[in-house]
């Protein structure tokens, strides 16, 4: 069960390692429906690893392997498929591109063109043409989340064999700036960047003072409303907590951005004791006494982003 030390681990190989040795570890928890009162379904690290291999197997005949980190865009609802896509295309040598759905057509096209993207993946219910128009990229719909996670049968294993030294500078994800002052600029994330976060989460206590981010390594259920096309929702509060640590990220509804109301429901029905949200969510909650009362069991409230 030997594991590379924190700061030298790689998401694809570490997910596979944990799926082998700690298969029942809870990676995340997802809503059973858009009605959050219906409860949440836990996803184990083994479920997550299988879903990645299933998607890699599905995509290999369509996009093949890349030796030059070809860009593969993905558009979908707010669900775990964003994280599955990141690792699945990485195992095939590609890098994922996420363009925020709120972006205008010119913004989407700018990101596709500047990253030399010729392949677009999407969920079945997404109208890609409304986002990218007649862009020449080849388009492929991917399976439903439930099929990727829990289809019968064992998918073929797609190993990630590179060492940390070989992969640390390799790109695996492209996000972008806000575009508030012009066209959004691509931000390429490397495996080395993700490893830096691994190191950061494992900084030991200094003179008895615990580094706050080390709490990511402790076991807790945490509601996060950061979208997966944002670095917060994809890496920092998407992959990192459940792979580098033991926080179980509880996801919001897939069909809409979570407001303060949904955040309260995530805490209530997802049994959360931690929150990761933007200041606007807290403003909504503190101005509603009923919601505020439901937050009594929350022992940590983290915030980030604009209002």
Indicate where each model-derived feature is located.
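Conserved AMP-binding/adenylate-forming
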Residues: 38-42, 56-103, 219-220, 224-227
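N-lobe entry segment of adenylate-forming
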Residues: 1-68, 162-165
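Adenylate-forming
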Residues: 18, 48, 52, 72, 125-129, 255, 270-307, ...
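Conserved AMP-binding A3 loop
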Residues: 42-46, 172-200
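ATP-dependent adenylate-forming carboxylate-activation enzymes
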Residues: 32, 76-77, 94-112, 124-127, ...
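Structural core segment of the AMP-binding/adenylate-forming
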Residues: 87, 91-165, 271, 278
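Conserved AMP-binding/adenylation subdomain of ANL enzymes
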Residues: 195-221, 228-276, 280-282, 288
């Amino acid at each position: 069960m030997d594991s590379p030390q924190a700061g030298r681990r790689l998401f694809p190989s570490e997910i596979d390692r944990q799926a082998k040795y700690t298969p029942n570890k809870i990676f995340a928890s997802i809503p059973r429906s858009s009605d959050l009162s219906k409860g949440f379904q836990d996803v184990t690290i083994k479920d997550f690893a299988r879903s990645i291999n299933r998607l890699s197997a599905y995509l290999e005949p369509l996009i093949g392997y890349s030796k030059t980190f070809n860009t593969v865009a993905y558009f979908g609802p707010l669900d775990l498929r964003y994280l599955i896509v990141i690792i699945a295309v990485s195992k095939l040598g590609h890098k994922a591109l996420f363009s925020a759905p709120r972006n205008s057509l010119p913004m989407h096209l700018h990101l596709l063109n500047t990253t030399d993207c010729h392949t677009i993946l999407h969920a079945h219910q997404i109208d890609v043409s409304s986002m990218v128009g007649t862009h020449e990229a080849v388009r492929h719909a991917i399976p439903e989340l439930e099929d990727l996670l829990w289809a019968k049968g064992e998918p073929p294993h797609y190993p990630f064999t590179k060492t940390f030294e070989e992969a640390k500078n390799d790109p695996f994800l492209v996000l972008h700036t806000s575009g508030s002052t012009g066209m959004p600029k691509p931000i390429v994330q490397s495996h080395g960047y993700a490893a830096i976060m691994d190191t950061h989460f494992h900084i030991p206590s200094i003179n008895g003072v615990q580094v706050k981010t080390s709490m990511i390594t402790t076991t807790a259920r945490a509601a996060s409303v950061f979208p997966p096309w944002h670095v917060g929702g994809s890496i920092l509060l998407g992959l990192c907590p459940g792979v580098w640590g033991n926080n179980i990220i509880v996801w919001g509804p897939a069909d809409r951005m979570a407001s303060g109301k949904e955040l309260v429901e995530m805490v209530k029905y997802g049994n959360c004791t931690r929150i990761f949200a933007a200041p606007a969510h807290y403003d909504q909650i503190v101005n509603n006494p009923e919601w505020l009362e439901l937050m009594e069991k929350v022992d940590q409230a983290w915030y980030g982003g604009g209002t």
